Curated annotation (Swiss-Prot):
UniProt keyword annotation of Heme present: no
GO (cellular component) term, any one: membrane
Lineage, uppermost ranks: Bacteria, Pseudomonadati, Pseudomonadota, Gammaproteobacteria, Methylococcales
Role summary: Methane monooxygenase is responsible for the initial oxygenation of methane to methanol in methanotrophs. At least in vitro, specific quinols can replace NADH as reductants.
Positions annotated to bind Cu cation 1: 33, 139
Membrane topology label: Multi-pass membrane protein
Record-given protein name: Particulate methane monooxygenase alpha subunit
An annotated Gene Ontology molecular function: monooxygenase activity
Subunit structure of this chain's protein: M.capsulatus has two forms of methane monooxygenase, a soluble (sMMO) and a membrane-bound (particulate) type (pMMO). The particulate type is a nonamer composed of three alpha:beta:gamma heterotrimeric protomers assembled into a cylindrical structure; the beta and gamma subunits comprise the bulk of the membrane-spanning regions and the soluble regions are derived primarily from alpha subunits which form two antiparallel beta-barrel-like structures each.
Free-text comment on the cofactor: Binds 3 copper ions per subunit. Two of these (copper ion 1 and 3) form a binuclear cluster.
Subcellular location: Membrane
């Protein structure tokens, strides 16, 4: 019996080791949507991205892609997130698969951080250049000091070609044209290898003798002063002197070779020009709002008043990059990411045209699997369970008005 048990244990161990070893031969590509891990309230109550467009879905190495649209800095900015006094327009992607050539807010070039005003809407444009082949999920993103990255909608872009074809030429202020992709690459490799060798030599010197147990015994015996000999001190001083000398000489050589240098530019750009949007002629009051967990749907009771001159209908509800549409009123033609677009996800109890001067209370339901897929339903577990978003109203000629809403959200488990 013991022999059988030993054989079972032996073959079980061999099988386990074989299975673990086999995993080394299978390494699938990682694919993830990082925005799902960001708190729902962050995506709902900070930056609202809309009217987005990606100029291309397939490019070759060295070709450019332009992302443009608008973003609204939500008036009900959460207290737990620092206000966007220092913000940076960024792009979320898996590493340097593209390089950013240009970034604009309000038509102004923004190579560094900017100050944004709460309650304002800005247009933006980012130009990217394809660097690495593959299928990449490219997001809009706003980095806020003290608030972290606020992720926006993302779209898959296919890059074709070979990375060896990539070029990133720039002309310096002295008139020299260089390729930043491989500029002074040999010099970079040399200094990395050089200081690595210095580090290995330093570690090698101190580890040439027994390291742990004998030295521990000497410390316990009260002979710690004997661990470092006079020769050790001389060698250490030699390493220190050589390091200082090399740094000084290398710096002097670099200053001589490149006499004209400009430091990296920092500081916060102010005076970003928001869009001058006309005040909406529609007012909306949220009477109550509930999220029905089993149905993956949010229901809102809205009181809508039309102060304008033409009848209007509700065509879209936007929150946290997810768009819920009433296809009878509005259809998307921008190529918005399909996983973030619920083309028939918006239903209104009475969505007949709301006449000028008329007030109507309606039940609005936004339903789609995106509530769970993108973890927006997690908002009901927050200590400040509030939702926020944008409502888009349209008249018969297609003119649009945007109204933001913000209200407590009550969960329903029935």
């Amino acid at each position: 019996m013991k022999t059988i048990k030993d054989r079972i244990a032996k073959w079980s161990a061999i099988g386990l080791l074989s299975a673990v070893a086999a995993t080394a031969f299978y390494a699938p590509s990682a694919s993830a949507h990082g925005e799902k891990s960001q708190a729902a309230f962050m995506r709902m109550r900070t930056i609202h991205w809309y009217d987005l467009s990606w100029s291309k879905e397939k490019v070759k190495i060295n070709e450019t892609v332009e992302i443009k649209g608008k973003f609204h800095v939500f008036e009900g900015w959460p207290e737990t997130v620092d206000e966007p006094d220092v913000a940076f327009l960024n792009v979320g992607m898996p590493g340097p698969v593209f390089i950013r050539k240009e970034s604009y807010i309000g038509g102004q070039l923004v190579p560094r951080s900017v100050r944004l005003e709460i309650g304002k809407t800005y247009d933006f444009r980012v130009v990217l250049k394809a660097r690495r082949p593959g299928d990449w999920h490219v997001h809009t993103m706003m980095n806020v000091q003290g608030g972290g990255p606020i992720i926006g909608p993302g779209k898959w872009i296919t890059v074709e070609g070979s990375m060896s074809e990539f070029r990133n030429p720039v002309t310096t202020l002295t008139g020299q044209t260089v390729d930043l992709e491989n500029y002074n690459e040999g010099n970079t490799y040399f200094w990395h290898a050089f200081w690595f060798a210095i580090g290995v030599a330093w570690i090698g010197y101190w580890s040439r003798r027994p390291i742990f147990i004998p030295r521990l015994l000497m410390v316990d015996a009260g002979r710690a002063d004997e661990l470092v000999s006079a020769t050790d001190r001389k060698v250490a001083m030699g390493f220190l002197a050589a390091t200082i000398l090399i740094v000084v000489m290398a710096m002097s050589s670099a200053n001589s070779k490149y006499p004209i240098t400009i430091p990296l530019q920092a500081g916060t750009m102010r005076g970003m020009k928001p869009l001058e949007l006309p005040a909406p002629t529609v007012s909306v009051k949220v009477e109550d709002a509930t999220y029905r967990v089993p149905g993956r749907a949010m229901r809102m009771k809205l009181t809508i008043t039309n102060h304008g001159n033409s009848p209007i209908r509700l065509g879209e509800f936007y929150t946290a990059s997810v768009r819920f549409l009433d296809s009878d009123v509005y259809k998307d033609t921008t190529g918005y990411p399909e996983d973030l677009l619920a083309e028939d996800g918006l239903s209104v109890s009475d969505n007949s045209p709301l006449a000028p001067g008329e007030t109507r209370t309606v039940d609005v339901t936004a339903s789609d699997a995106a509530w769970e897929v993108y973890r927006l339903s997690d908002i009901i577990y927050d200590p400040d369970s509030r939702f926020a978003g944008l409502l888009f109203f349209f008249d018969a000629t297609g003119n649009r008005q945007v109204v933001q809403i913000d209200a407590p959200l009550i969960p329903s488990f029935m």
